[in-house]
């Protein structure tokens, strides 16, 4: 191995993680910040990284508001009942009111959607899910991130967040290393979006048999990523 070097990168917005959340955040950051320098850092490769790397057969939440199938209030009620009241209803409502427009955007980007031959509506499996041919799900969203970011850094494992020395309790960047070369990377940013992974297996499910249904969650989805 050659001499290890240190690479510095300054930006306006740093996105840590290149899964669905990170690539989506990169796209949204560009939409709202046309003139900003945006950098996304991923430990694998954004084309096939994160929980959707292998693709999905369904999108697990779609209101269908244009056809009056469900409304955000319905989803809040469902989540409240499922979690026995332990829910941030404001956040659930905010997610629900935006999810349809996001699905429509994926449709426009070329995600193959299954449709009812008679009505033309998205084909459902149950009350909330809609069916897709989702092998290309992640590459489609990754392509949007590539077009949005000034730089995409693949194979960089972020190990620590950097605190802003001038503002208390404010993150000002991150450090990590290249998993192939060993080079160190120091990212300094005006804002940092942490999208480094979700969390599962942190509590016992309440439904009988639900444990078996959740065994497909991988060990990495454990909430350890700078939550």
Positions of predicted regions on the chain:
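Core beta-strand elements of the Rossmann-like FAD/NAD(P) dinucleotide-binding domain
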Residues: 8-11, 181-191
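N-terminal/domain-start segments enriched in small and hydrophobic, helix-friendly residues
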Residues: 2-18
């Amino acid at each position: 191995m050659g001499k290890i070097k240190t690479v510095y990168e300054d930006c306006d917005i740093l996105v840590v993680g290149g899964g669905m959340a990170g690539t989506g955040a990169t796209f949204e950051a560009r939409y709202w910040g046309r003139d900003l320098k945006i950098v996304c850092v991923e430990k694998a490769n954004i084309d096939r990284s994160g929980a959707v790397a292998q693709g999905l057969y369904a999108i697990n939440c779609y209101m269908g508001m244009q056809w009056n199938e469900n409304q955000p209030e319905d989803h809040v009620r469902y989540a409240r009942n499922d979690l026995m009241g332990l829910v941030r209803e404001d956040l659930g409502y905010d997610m629900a009111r935006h999810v349809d427009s996001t699905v429509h955007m994926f449709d426009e980007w070329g995600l193959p959607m299954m449709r009812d031959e008679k009505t033309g509506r998205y084909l459902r499996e149950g009350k909330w899910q809609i069916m897709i041919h989702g092998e290309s799900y992640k590459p489609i969203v990754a392509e949007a991130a590539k077009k949005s970011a000034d730089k995409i850094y693949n194979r960089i494992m972020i190990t620590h967040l950097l605190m802003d020395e001038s503002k208390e309790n404010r993150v000002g960047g991150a450090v990590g290393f290249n998993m192939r070369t060993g080079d160190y990377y120091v990212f300094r940013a005006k804002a940092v979006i942490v999208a480094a992974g979700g969390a599962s297996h942190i509590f016992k499910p309440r439904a009988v048999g639900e444990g078996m249904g959740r065994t497909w969650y991988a060990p990495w989805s454990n909430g350890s990523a700078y939550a």
